Structures are given as C-alpha cells and as structure tokens.
Amino acid sequence: MMATPATDLISDNDKYNKQCLSDSSDSGSDVSFFSVNESEGELDTMEKVDTLIGGARVISNKVEKDSDSEQRGRKKETTGPNNYHNLEEKQASAISLDADDEDLDEIISYSHDGNYDSSHKTFSFSLPFGNTNFRSSSPLAIIKTVLPKTPDEFIKKNLRKNEIKQKLKKSTSISSLEEIELFKYERGIDNSRLRAVKESLEMDALKNSIKQITADPFDKTHDGYYRSRLESIWNELEGDVVIMGGYRGSVLRDATTHKRIWIPLKAGLNMTKVDLLIGPNDEDELKTQKEIVPDGMLTHIGPVDISKRLIKRLDANPNLNVQQFGYDWRLSLDISAKHLTTKLEEIYNKQKNKKGIYIIAHSMGGLVAHKVLQDCTHLIRGIIYVGSPSQCPNILGPIRFGDDVMWNKTIFTKETNFFMRSSFYFLPLDGRCFVDKITLERYDFDFFDTDVWKTLGLSPLVNEKREESAHEKSKLLPRKTKSALSLKATLNATTKFVLNAPVVRNVAGNNKQVPRDVPFDEVFHTSYEDSCEYLARTLKRTKNYLDSLDYDPNKEYPPLAMVYGNKVPTVRGAKVNGIQDIKDGNYEDFYYGPGDGVVHHKWLLPEQRGFPVVCKIASSSGHVSLMTDLKSMAKAFISIVDSEKEGRRSRTRTSS
C-alpha cells in the first residue's frame, strides 16, 4: 500500500499549493515517492510530489509516543534502560504535520540529472580537499559534469521555474512547494570543488573588461546598482581591510619547523603524515596553539581560487591597507575571536582617524567576526558576511563518519573531527535535521544535550556501544589496576592520550593487538569517560558563544552586508526510517532547498540573529567560490560605503 500526498493538509484557500500538488500527481514528474514497505530499502517511483512536513519550532525534553509508526506497520523502536529512559524522557518531540507552519520543511527526492553526486551518502561540506564521503566517480561521470548541458535539459526550464528564480534573484524567500518545483530534477550533493575549478577556469576578468568598455554608464543591474560603479567602487575604498576564511580556510604550520601542515599536497597523496588531533582537555587546546600556528588565509588551492583575485583587486588600490587574518580553525571560536580582536586593536590604534576596519569574512569566519562585533563594536567599520552560516547541520556527517583529504583517510578521522572544537558551532539551534520518511513527522532534537549524542550515537566516541564496552572492560579490571590506571590518566591528561600509550595498555592487562574486525578509524586514543566529559564542556561552551550573537537594540552597529548563494541545491536535512535509522547512521536520503551547496539560504548570518543589513546580494557561485564573484563583492562594498555616507549626512543634519 502506498502512502498518499497530504493534500488535505494544505489550506483550502491556497489554490496554488493545492493545484501544484494535483498537477504533480498527474504530470510526468520524476519525483520519487516512498513506499511504506522499506524492508529492502527500495524506492517506489511515482509521478507525484513528495509529501510535505511541518510543525512549530520545538525543542523539548519530552517525547510523545510514536503511535503513527505502529499504525503504519513499523516495528516499535527497541530501547534499553539507558536509552533516555526508553528515549521518551529526552528525545525532542516528533512534530506532526501542520499546514500553518511558517517554514514548511519539504521531503524531496531527486532524479539523477544535474551536476550533483548521486552516490553521496552522508552529510558533508564538500570543501576543497575534504569531506569526500562518497564512492569514487567514474571517468564518464566526471566528464559529464564538465560538459555543458544538452538543449533538451534547457527545455525543462519552464516559465514557472523562471518565475521562482526571479524571486530568488530578488532575494525573496520561496515556499516549500516552489523549492520542490525548482529542484525536483536534482539529486545528491553539489560538487563544490568541481564547481570552483570550473569557475576558476572561466575568463571572467576578460569578459568583465569587455562589458565595462561597451556598457552604458547609466545602465543598472536588476537590483539597482550602476554597472559602471561595479568597477569604480574598488577605487573609492580607503582605509583598512581584513579578510578571513572559514572552516579549514587558513594555512596551518608547524611552530618549530614552519612546515606547512594544512594543506600539504603530499599528505593528500598519503606520502606524509599530518596529525591535527587535539586532546580532550582545555590544556590540550592551549598546548596545540604552541605547536601549530596559523599563517594567513588559504587563498587558493592549485587552480581553485578562493580569494586570491579579490585580494589582488583590493591591493591594487593604494589607499587600502589589506591584511589577511589566519586562525586555527580547529579551536573554540571564542579563542579565535580574541585573536581577531587583538589584530584589529593593533590596526585601530595606528589609525589617525578612528574609523575602524572593514572585515570580509567567509563562512565560519563570519561567526568569528560577529563575536568581535558584539564585544568590540567600535573596532569594526563594516562587515561583509560571505556565505556565513548561523547553523549548518551538514557537520553531523564529518563528526559521525570522518572524511577524506584527497586519498588520505587519516587526517580527518572521526576522532579528529570530534575533538575539533569548531565543529560544534555549526549545530542547529532549532534542532531541525531529521525527518521520518514514513510517518511524515519531524524529529527535533536538542543537539546541545549530551544524552542526545549518546543515545543517537552522533559520534562513535560517545555512543551506547562504546559505553557498554567501557563498562564491560571496567568490570574485568582488578580494583588495584583501576586505581593505577586512574592515576596514570590523571598524570598524563595534559600531555598525551593515556589510553594510547603502550605502558597503560599493559597496566590494563591488554597485551593483544587491536582486533582485526575493528576499523582503523574506530581505534580511539581517548577513553569513553574523557570523551563524554569533553563533549559536555564543549557543548556548554559552544551554546554560550552562540547565545551571545543575537542583535542588541542598545548598540549602534556599523553597516553589515551579506553575499550568499541561492542557486545550488543544498542539503537541509535527512529523511530517516525512524530513530533507529539515526542511531545506525543512515543519513543517506536528503531533502533540499536553495543555497550555495553548503549553506541554505535561510541559515545565513547575521540575518538569522535579527540584524538589519544594508544589502543581501545573491550569487550564483558555490560556497567555496563566493569571494571570486567580484560583481557581488562590489555590490556589497557599494552598499556599505553609501550607508556610511548617509550616516555622516544624518549626523551632520542632527548636529546642525
């Protein structure tokens, strides 16, 4: 028996939404629809739109029993006594369908058309040389993504799609049904690396130069900017500019040898070893800052431009002092924010006219810069947030499964990603990520609750299986041995991971090699107990940081601008077959919305924190390449400069 679309949940007065569902049922849509019987993991393809899900934003510590799942034939979830007390006291409420939800989440299945990796099976960021948790693409598939689309594919773009794209072009939000129409022919994650390579190889500079020569000086873009000023703004700018990258976006070097640790080509080819693992204690985070130091932005990787052309364009202006800010992107963001504050203070103290500093912040860099904006507002003249997320649940993939750097699987292991403090700053505060594909309910979890991590197994370092293993080993150890091991752990807590030391393994009576059936990336250096303590501290520290980023009406903020992507299908969450699927790590069935391939267009900073912005510039570039879109960056600077001028005129009128 097949599930039916929830047309009865759509408001009667919303004729378009109803008609859209009806049309999708009758037309030759390629959208897949799930059968209730998922025993073999197969999809029953129907010519229907997937059912919508919704509900109010809820994160609670009570759970309602999943009666619908029993009615639909699913086996009742089995939970042990340690599973949140049968998971009913700690799992956030599963939200029933609600047509009045202001932000309906959609469950969308895609066909195999488009430049998206259909073999992708886990969340990832798809950054350069990282997050490649999918099977190797065939040469034919790679060639297909590089070649232009055929005329038949362009025919698919009907009038309705163009209308939706125009709404996105005008930075207008689109409904869930419109997202279905726009992205129903896509599947999988966007290949941001390939997109960045292709954009880097395009002759944008030459094309823009020709356009500038032939352009009417009074001609305007669709969003009201004079085309001639898109070129002249680079000469209007004056003062100090600091540009910073995001997650994995700064060069890291060995403090002693000055050798490049991130990212060396040899490491990606498995020709050398790189150790980016941080210990579980606060002292370990302090120690690693003495051993590994940042050294500027990662401006490009081979042919992939990230910010090199932008910096070159800014440097061409003699009235600008452009500096890069590199930071250790593994650390807690409050540490990086303090380092940025120190740098900005040094620049500010040298200014004769205390105007402050312009900041261009890409991705996670926006989270760092925003903290400085809150704490030391006077240092900042303006910020351009480039694809900066207020949340990004994609991080759950690297934490749970690890990810690769080219052909190297040992750099970003499950343990390394778990102990990267910065990873947790992407966790969704609204708890939204997982959707039940059968009952059409949304599972909203408090991702800042350690019990959620343990029960759902969001990291193998703190899951129930490892807890049981630690408990069994503890029962086998003699009391004296336990005391010796505990003392040993205390003495070595701030230097090396105790459980990885051979002498400690001998004390524990474990002289055997690691069992062959244990994967190499699940042989952990840190004990279960230490991992849990670390998780509790880190979640609390992260939550406090994120809570400090909201708009303060009592402060006078400088002009803030946003450059973001809204043309690339972007993962919003995963459809799962019950909570057991989450425990088993079956994050393989995604639902999407417009974004830059990493950050959804509704997750953006600072907008989601209640901040007004002087402009919100939509770009067609992917996440990695957003700063290479010089036209969009020029628009952002124009808006900031004009806002400054208007502010000065306003103050002059007030004083007079």
Swiss-Prot record:
Compositional bias (Basic and acidic residues): 62-78
GO cellular component: cytoplasm; mitochondrion
Subcellular location: Cytoplasm; Mitochondrion
SUPFAM superfamilies on file: alpha/beta-Hydrolases
Residue list for modification Phosphoserine: 39
Gene3D superfamilies documented for this protein: alpha/beta hydrolase
Compositional bias (Low complexity): 22-36
GO terms, molecular function: O-acyltransferase activity
Alphabetical UniProt keywords: Cytoplasm, Mitochondrion, Phosphoprotein
Ranges where the record places region Disordered: 1-41, 60-88
Record GO biological process: lipid metabolic process
UniProt miscellaneous comment: Present with 1230 molecules/cell in log phase SD medium.
PANTHER family according to UniProt: LECITHIN-CHOLESTEROL ACYLTRANSFERASE-RELATED
The protein, known as: Uncharacterized protein YJR098C
Native source organism of the sequence: Saccharomyces cerevisiae (strain ATCC 204508 / S288c)
